[in-house]
Regions:
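A glycine/serine/threonine-rich, flexible loop-to-helix segment
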Residues: 114, 124-148
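C-terminal substrate-recognition "lid" of short-chain dehydrogenase/reductases
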Residues: 73, 153-180
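Active-site helix of classical SDR
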Residues: 61, 97, 105
Length: 185
């Protein structure tokens, strides 16, 4: 969904079907190859990672905000990553893309709080049941090894959804990132 044209068509369809833009935007794009050494990350891989993880959230926010401002209410929630805060098992290209998302969240939250719009992010790490971690054995010996997670298990998509719902329901919480990592740093 990195194409601005595709995203614009999506918004046109929403406008046509519902007669208005979205009140709540949840941007949950995620891509990242586990390439630990910067020397092994090609410029194309770096660009692709930012184009998937950061660019669509910018475009979606840009298209959502006018409607939210008009109605004086809105929620924008980005699904970021522990990597945005310097942790995780992916490379610096992934961390940079998610840190960019965190910066976008902070900037939009400050600018649009007065408009009745909250902007936050949930920063999960080591979430199972998504297909991204096919087997806990893959993680053995890495920073994401389940034995390194203080709660002793992977997180679940439902736990991520619970944080997203909290952000949707809470108008006094903006500019915040909830690290959902089982205590992993």
């Amino acid at each position: 969904m990195a194409s601005a044209e595709e995203i614009q068509r999506l918004f046109d369809d929403i406008q046509h079907l519902y007669g208005k833009g979205p009140d709540i935007l949840i941007s949950n794009a995620g891509y990242g190859k586990r390439i630990r050494d910067i020397a092994d990350i090609s410029i194309d891989e770096f660009d692709y990672t930012l184009n998937v993880n950061l660019r669509p959230s910018f475009i979606l926010s840009k298209l959502s905000l006018p409607h939210m401002i008009t109605y004086g209410w809105g929620r924008i929630i980005f699904v970021s990553s522990l990597a945005a805060h310097g942790g995780g098992i992916n490379g610096c290209h992934y961390a940079a893309s998610k840190a960019g998302l965190h910066g976008l969240m902070k900037s939009l939250a400050t600018k649009h709080a007065k408009d009745g719009i909250t902007v936050n992010d949930v920063a999960p790490a080591m979430i199972g049941e998504t297909g991204l971690i096919p087997d806990e054995k893959v993680l053995e010996g890495t920073a994401g090894d389940v034995r390194n997670i203080p709660v002793g298990r992977l997180g679940t998509p439902k736990e991520v959804a619970n944080v997203v719902m909290m952000f949707c329901q809470t108008g006094y919480l903006t500019g915040q990132s909830v690290l959902l990592s089982g205590g992993l740093k």
